[in-house]
C-alpha cells in the first residue's frame, strides 16, 4: 500500500474542500525515516491511499523522488533519463485535465487495443481491470483477481499516456495480484 500526495485537501475544520492542489501528484511509502503524517491536518499535505502502483499510476500519480527514489528513477528513466521532475509533473497534469472542463473523466480517456498496452496498465471494461500477464484482472481492495482474457475490441485506458510509456519502457510497478505479489 502507498500514500498519495496531492497537497492540502482539507480546511481548518478538517473537511475535504478540494480534489488537489498543484501539479505534484506523487506516490509515497507509508513509512519513511520515522515520519508520521496525520490524516486530515490543515495546512499540511493530506494523504490518500493506493493499493499498489497500478492504482496510483491510473489516478495520475508518479513515484516520489524522495521516499521512493529508486522507483522514481526507474519510472523517469523508462520515459527519458534527461526528464526533470517538473516536466513529468506538467505532462501528467496535462493528461489529467481536460481544458475548460476540469479533471478528465473515464469517458475522455484514449482507446487502445490490449495488444498495444504493457503490463501494469489499468483499463475500464465493466469496471477497472489491470492488464497483467496477458489477462485482465478485476479490482478489489484485497488485490487484483479473477483473470479473464483480454478482449479484441479497443479498451478505454485509465492510466495516463506518460505512465503507459514508463510501463512500456520497463518500469516495473509494485502490483498486488491475488495469489502473487510482484515487487
Regions found by a protein language model. Give the residues of each.
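Mature, structured domains enriched in cysteine- and short glycine motifs
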Residues: 1-183
Amino acid at each position: 500500500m502507498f500514500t498519495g500526495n496531492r497537497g492540502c485537501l482539507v480546511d481548518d475544520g478538517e473537511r475535504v474542500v478540494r480534489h488537489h492542489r498543484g501539479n505534484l501528484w506523487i506516490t509515497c511509502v507509508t513509512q519513511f525515516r520515522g515520519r508520521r503524517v496525520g490524516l486530515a491536518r490543515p495546512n499540511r499535505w493530506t494523504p490518500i491511499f493506493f493499493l499498489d502502483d497500478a492504482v496510483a499510476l491510473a489516478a495520475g500519480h508518479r513515484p516520489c523522488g524522495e521516499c521512493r527514489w529508486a522507483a522514481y528513477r526507474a519510472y523517469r528513466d523508462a520515459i527519458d533519463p534527461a526528464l526533470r521532475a517538473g516536466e513529468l509533473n506538467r505532462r501528467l497534469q496535462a493528461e489529467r485535465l481536460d481544458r475548460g472542463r476540469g479533471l478528465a473523466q473515464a469517458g475522455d480517456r484514449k482507446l487502445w487495443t490490449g495488444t498495444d498496452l504493457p503490463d501494469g496498465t489499468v483499463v475500464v471494461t465493466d469496471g477497472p481491470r489491470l492488464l497483467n500477464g496477458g489477462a485482465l484482472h478485476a479490482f478489489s481492495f484485497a488485490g487484483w483477481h479473477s483473470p479473464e482474457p483480454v478482449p479484441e475490441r479497443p479498451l478505454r485506458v485509465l492510466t495516463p499516456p506518460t505512465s503507459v510509456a514508463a510501463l512500456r519502457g520497463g518500469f516495473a510497478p509494485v502490483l498486488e495480484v491475488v495469489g502473487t505479489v510482484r515487487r
